[in-house]
């Protein structure tokens, strides 16, 4: 199960959205 990789990718996108 590659949940960690997905979580990292989602976390990066969420951080980008919060920065704006």
UniProtKB/Swiss-Prot annotation:
InterPro entries: Cupiennin. It comes from Cupiennius salei. GO terms for cellular component: extracellular region. GO terms for biological process: defense response to bacterium. The modification Glutamic acid 1-amide is found at residue 20. It is found in: Secreted. Pfam families: Cu. Its main location: secreted. The keyword Secreted applies. This is Short cationic peptide-3a. Keywords: Amidation, Oxidation, Secreted, Toxin. Expressed by the venom gland. Transmembrane segments: none annotated. Belongs to the cationic peptide 04 (cupiennin) family. 03 subfamily. One of its GO terms (molecular function) is toxin activity.
